[in-house]
Each structure stands twice: as C-alpha cells, then as structure tokens.
C-alpha cells in the first residue's frame, strides 16, 4: 500500500475536541438529540486548523469536524518556533484577544481554550488575555484571526520595499 504525500502529512496532525454541544428537539415520540463539535488539529510546528460540524451522532460530528479542520489548515509565523514576532489585539464577534510575545522560559500564559490552540500551533512562550465574549466559537475565531494577522520582520520590510539583511 502506497501513501500519498498529503495523507502522510495528515498523519502527523494531532486532533483535539475543543467543545461538544448537545441540542434537543421535542418530537411526537419524545426528544431527538443532535450534536455539534468544535475540533482543533495541529502539528505543533506552525500548522493549525479548526473545524465545526453538526450531526445526529456524536462520533459523526467529531469525525466531520476533524475533516473540516484538516481542510482549513493555516501556517503561523513564529520567531524561531518559540514566540510570536509582535503584539496583536483583535476583535471577532464580541470576543477580543490580546497576544503578547514573551521571553524564553515564560511558557504559555492563557486561558484553557486559547492555551490549547497555542500549544497545538507550536508556540512555547506567549502571554494571552481573552476579553469580552466567552463563547468558545468566537474565542477560537479571534485566536485564528490574531495568528493570521502576524507578520514577520521580513514581510514588513518587503511591504515597505526596504532591502535589509
């Protein structure tokens, strides 16, 4: 059996269930339950993805969420794979997130959801503060927006059309 390059890369991704939600609908025969799941995948080296899915069975919701997360992979700019290059503050649907770079040895100082996202992204030293909404979906969206807005020194110099070594 031969594995393609894509399937080999996906095998390195770690999958975590961030939130599971159960909804009920009252029908003639009783209650009918459905589930939604928010799934996070990452390799700890700068690749990260998030997926949200709904299904009538919990296992199906988790599986579909994992597939959606693998389709939405992003790559994150870090400083030597350790911290972020600069401070960033983002607003997303009522949730605010502040990310600050930290010195080596600080670790990840953040709430549980944001900590999990940063660990799976491979960031080791960072300070994060979540403000506003505590909705998990909004916090995850804010974290992804913040991580996508990061730019390296090289990118900034290139945008300014400055050549520097």
Swiss-Prot record:
Keyword Endoplasmic reticulum among record annotations: no
Q: Which residues form the S5 DRBM domain?
A: 13-76
Q: Which Pfam families match?
A: Ribosomal_S5, Ribosomal_S5_C
MF-aspect GO terms: rRNA binding; structural constituent of ribosome
One GO BP on record is: translation
Query: Could you confirm whether the keyword Repeat appears in this record?
Result: no
Q: Which cysteine-cysteine pairs are annotated as disulfide bonds in the entry?
A: none
Q: Where is the signal peptide?
A: none
Coiled-coil residues: none
Keywords, ordered alphabetically: Ribonucleoprotein, Ribosomal protein, RNA-binding, rRNA-binding
- Report the InterPro entries cross-referenced here: Ribosomal_Su5_D2-typ_SF, Ribosomal_uS5, Ribosomal_uS5_bac-type, Ribosomal_uS5_C, Ribosomal_uS5_N, Ribosomal_uS5_N_CS, Ribsml_uS5_D2-typ_fold_subgr
A GO cellular component entry from the record:
small ribosomal subunit
Q: What family does the Swiss-Prot or TrEMBL record give for this protein?
A: Belongs to the universal ribosomal protein uS5 family.
Subunit relationships: Part of the 30S ribosomal subunit. Contacts proteins S4 and S8.
Domain writeup? The N-terminal domain interacts with the head of the 30S subunit; the C-terminal domain interacts with the body and contacts protein S4. The interaction surface between S4 and S5 is involved in control of translational fidelity.
The record ties this protein, via PANTHER family, to: MITOCHONDRIAL RIBOSOMAL PROTEIN S5
Q: What's this protein's function?
A: With S4 and S12 plays an important role in translational accuracy. Located at the back of the 30S subunit body where it stabilizes the conformation of the head with respect to the body.
Q: What is this protein called?
A: Small ribosomal subunit protein uS5
Species for this entry: Chlamydia felis (strain Fe/C-56) (Chlamydophila felis)
Q: What is the lineage of its organism?
A: Bacteria, Pseudomonadati, Chlamydiota, Chlamydiia, Chlamydiales
